[in-house]
């Protein structure tokens, strides 16, 4: 948590600053598999996004094998293979900071996050009752930042409501805690997020 929040780590009382750029990627196996443990809400909240990966198609697996055979994943791959170097990443981070997000878009994002805490104002009662805990204020920050990053990837210097919608599930799915009844009924966080996005007015 210290590394993710403060960009430093403390070992034996000595503080070591972490290099820039720095990011944390983690994999999470299904909780029902042996040797897996549920992360706390505070730990999950530190992750900006959560993607869900399925098994690759046969064609994708074939491509993976071909790339391995071609040396794409070697420790010292040849130059010109499309990888980003550190300077390019730092340049993209600088460009990201220049993406404009209007106050109305920030308000829109905050309303979406607030709806996860007060779902009865936005969802049918039987669905609203399935949410045990809504997303924290950190979710609003992450939603706005992810929207700006999406805008940059789309080639725009400003964020629009569609950017917020495009990243909402990735930002919120791990921050909404559902009751056991939701799993029993086959209701997912993504389903509830869709419902909220349909109910929160778009600016």
Describe each region flagged by the PLM:
Residues 2, 25, 42-45, 49, ...:
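Solvent-exposed alpha-helical segments within well-ordered globular domains of core cellular machineries
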Residues 4-98, 148-150:
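Canonical AAA+ ATPase core
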Residues 13, 35, 97-100, 135, ...:
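Short coil/turn residues that cap or connect secondary-structure elements
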Residues 40, 57, 84-86, 102, ...:
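Helix N-cap and loop-to-helix transition residues
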Residues 55-73, 79, 97-101, 117, ...:
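Non-catalytic accessory segments flanking P-loop/AAA+ NTPase cores
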Residues 76-121, 125-140:
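Conserved AAA+ ATPase small/helical "lid" subdomain
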Residues 118-203:
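C-terminal engagement/docking regions of AAA+ P-loop ATPases
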């Amino acid at each position: 948590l210290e590394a993710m929040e403060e960009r430093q780590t403390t070992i034996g009382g000595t503080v070591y600053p972490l290099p820039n750029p720095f990011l944390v990627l983690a994999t999470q196996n299904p909780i029902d598999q042996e040797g897996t443990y549920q992360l706390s809400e505070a730990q999950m909240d530190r992750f900006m996004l959560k993607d869900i990966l399925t098994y690759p198609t046969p064609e994708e697996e074939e491509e993976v094998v071909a790339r391995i055979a071609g040396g794409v994943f070697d420790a010292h791959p040849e130059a010109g293979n499309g990888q980003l170097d550190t300077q390019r990443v730092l340049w993209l981070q600088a460009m990201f900071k220049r993406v404009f997000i209007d106050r109305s878009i920030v308000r829109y994002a905050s309303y979406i996050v607030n709806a996860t805490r007060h779902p009865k104002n936005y969802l049918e009662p039987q669905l609203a009752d399935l949410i045990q805990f809504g997303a924290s204020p950190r979710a609003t920050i992450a939603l706005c930042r992810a929207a700006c990053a999406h805008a940059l990837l789309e080639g725009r210097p400003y964020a629009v409501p569609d950017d917020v919608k495009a990243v909402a599930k990735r930002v919120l799915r791990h921050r909404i805690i559902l009751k056991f009844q939701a799993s029993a009924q086959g209701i997912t966080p993504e389903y509830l997020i869709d419902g909220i996005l349909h109910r929160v007015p778009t600016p």
